[in-house]
């Protein structure tokens, strides 16, 4: 909590950085939900794109975990009780629940050990997993090709060189588009 207070009160524009971080995370979820809705509308979960959808769902689960762990980091009453409730939900799983909750908390109660554990997961571990899943998601998309609302399979009609005649090459067009989107 002291570090958040320091950033908010003593670092120049620290309050803006913190609020941009939290608001940006919420905005990112809006974009993720729109992306998932588009995938549902286009039927992107159907064959042959099931692997792309699976990677997308795993990305979503990791994003939810990332958001939950970030929610705990201000270490206020809301974040403490939120962590208490969510970790105790894991404790209700039959047979392994108590040990799983103890493993997640790092102690018998939500404490500094939980905060340190969630900080490390929020800043290092989950972003690395997310990066790997995003690379796998894009690689699977590159292999099968993206979907469209018309349901036209662009990879069916290929030229003599094996390049689809009805589509746009992934590189450089989508690569540049994605880089511009990230920036």
Where are these regions (language model features)?
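Membrane-embedded and interfacial regions of multi-pass energy-transducing membrane proteins
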Residues: 1-27, 31-183
């Amino acid at each position: 909590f002291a570090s958040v207070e320091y950033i908010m009160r003593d670092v120049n524009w620290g309050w803006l950085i913190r609020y941009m971080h939290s608001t940006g995370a919420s905005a990112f979820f809006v974009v993720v939900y729109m992306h998932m809705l588009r995938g549902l509308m286009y039927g992107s979960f159907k064959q042959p794109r099931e692997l792309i959808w699976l990677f997308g769902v795993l990305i979503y689960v990791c994003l939810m975990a990332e958001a939950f762990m970030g929610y705990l980091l201000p270490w206020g009453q809301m974040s403490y009780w939120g962590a208490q409730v969510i970790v105790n939900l894991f404790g209700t799983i039959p047979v392994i629940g108590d040990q799983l909750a103890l493993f997640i908390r790092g102690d018998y109660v939500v404490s500094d050990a939980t905060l340190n554990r969630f900080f490390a997961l929020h800043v290092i571990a989950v972003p690395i997993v997310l990066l790997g899943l995003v690379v796998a998601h894009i690689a699977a998309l590159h292999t099968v090709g993206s979907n469209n609302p018309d349901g036209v399979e662009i990879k069916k009609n290929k030229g003599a060189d094996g390049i689809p005649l009805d589509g746009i090459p992934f590189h450089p067009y989508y690569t540049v588009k994605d880089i511009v989107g990230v920036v």
